[in-house]
């Protein structure tokens, strides 16, 4: 059985060590009764060491919002997987829409990052999702299949179980409301079908939804069979809000 998972991406909103410490010190105690749900945070890159120190000895996972496609070398401004390992981090975010749209990351580069993370025993949270809303389930599956085939063509089949897919339809990111629940479930089901068609064991892969997640829609979303958790954005900047989401997932999926 797949363990429920809730994560938060701080992007570049909470950027100082003091702010990050305040958020974590407030949040950690609020999660003590939810051991049935895995949690992780992608803090602002400049606060990773602070995050590592505060989360040492806890089950709260963390990692950077991006990583280099190579272990080391002339890659100015990149973040090495060696640094991730040195921090005792266990997750890395890969392929977010903003990385592709603002920094022009290519699919081939993202695929290399995924493979490198898996080879180094770091769990990649891989962001996938169509740019525009699909008109029907076939169109939706075709759009997702094109992405998945390109991103995961080099991984070993056994590595699928260590992948987390974050389904974030680009047209729903940062909007006032999420995609409709039946649309979300159709996308998650399609992703499982695609994994199976590629030879992976879709029953082991955790797929979480991100895109305008809130307390108001969390239960309805995670009630869906193929949704394993949630990827929270700005709504989770208040510690109690994030804890409330974890609580909802625990009650709904537990």
From Swiss-Prot:
Its EC number is 5.3.1.1. GO terms for cellular component: cytosol. It is found in: Cytoplasm. Keywords: Cytoplasm, Gluconeogenesis, Glycolysis, Isomerase. GO terms for molecular function: triose-phosphate isomerase activity. It is an enzyme of class 5 (isomerase). InterPro entries: Aldolase_TIM, TIM_sf, Triosephosphate_isomerase, Triosephosphate_isomerase_AS. GO terms for biological process: gluconeogenesis; glyceraldehyde-3-phosphate biosynthetic process; glycerol catabolic process; glycolytic process. SUPFAM superfamilies: Triosephosphate isomerase (TIM) (SSF51351). CDD domains: TIM. The active site is at residues 96, 168. Belongs to the triosephosphate isomerase family. This is Probable triosephosphate isomerase 2. It comes from Listeria monocytogenes serotype 4b (strain F2365). The gene is tpiA2.
